[in-house]
Design a protein with these regions (language model features):
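Active-site mouth loops of central-metabolism enzymes
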Residues: 1-10, 75-90, 126-135
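N-terminal binding-site loop/beta-alpha segment at the start of enzyme catalytic domains
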Residues: 1-67, 87-90, 94, 103, ...
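Active-site-proximal loop/turn and secondary-structure-junction residues that shape catalytic pockets
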Residues: 2, 31-33, 68-72, 109-114, ...
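Beta/alpha (TIM)-barrel catalytic core signal, keyed to glycine-rich beta->alpha loops juxtaposed to Asp/Glu
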Residues: 10, 113-209
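Conserved beta-strand positions in the central sheet of alpha/beta enzyme cores
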Residues: 25-28, 106-109, 157, 185
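Surface-exposed, active-site-proximal loop segments in enzymatic domains
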Residues: 36-40, 70-86, 116-126
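Short acidic capping loops at alpha-helix termini that bridge into adjacent secondary structure
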Residues: 59-62, 103-107, 154-155, 179-182
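Active-site gating/metal-coordination segments in enzymes
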Residues: 73-109
Length: 209
């Protein structure tokens, strides 16, 4: 996530060479990287990875994950606003595939929910409800299902999601025979233990990675 901002392409190449030599073959990135987010470096990390694939011809050695961003105020990302409708997800995926110089993504993740919600403690204490229009979860899941069928993505995942959001995705996948969420990438470290409050049990009982 730092390649293209804090790290050069050459440094990124060195890190990827070292990673694969050490047997690290699951690589995760996102369309918004490098970090911190800004228009000038949007998509740069994906481009560097794609350039490495082109140089080394080792795409088939890597399990590749990337993410599409959710609701955003950044107008340079598809005009801003909600991002999980059919047109915007399809556009985001095609642009990621182009930057990554590949024709498929192994794990395609929703970087954060399209609905407005508290993330990383930004709204203070606890849950705060927002009444706002958003792309329904079922609509988003149907879009992802079509992209799985097309062969452009193999599996789907979430990121920065809540137990309620995950439960909705699982509910629809089971009721309607749609692709199932295989993983959720949430913050979990010494300072942030919120995963243990609800998501850890949910993941274990629902067999989500």
């Amino acid at each position: 996530m730092t390649w293209g901002e804090q790290n050069t392409q050459e440094e990124g190449f060195e890190q990827m060479d070292y990673a694969i030599d050490q047997g690290v073959n699951f690589w995760d990135t996102a369309e918004i990287y490098s970090i911190p987010m800004r228009e000038e470096t949007y998509g740069e990390t994906e481009r560097i990875i794609g350039n490495w694939f082109e140089k080394t011809n080792k795409r088939n050695k890597i399990v590749l994950a990337t993410k599409v961003c959710g609701n955003t105020s950044n107008k340079y990302i598809r005009g801003g606003g909600y991002n999980f409708g059919k047109k915007k997800i399809a556009q985001a995926l095609d642009e990621s595939l182009k930057r990554l110089k590949t024709d498929y993504i192994d794990l395609y993740q929703l970087h954060w929910p399209d609905r407005r919600m508290s993330m990383f403690g930004a709204d203070g204490l606890g849950y705060k409800h927002y009444e706002a229009e958003t792309v329904p979860i079922l609509e988003t899941l149907n879009v992802l299902s079509d992209l799985v069928k097309s062969g452009k993505i193999r599996y789907i995942g979430l990121s920065n999601e809540t137990p309620w959001g995950l439960s909705e995705f699982i509910k629809y996948s089971e009721q309607l025979d749609l692709p199932r969420i295989v993983s959720v990438q949430n913050a979990y470290n010494f300072l942030n233990r919120t995963y243990e409050l609800g998501m850890s049990e949910f993941h274990h009982r629902s067999q989500v990675g």
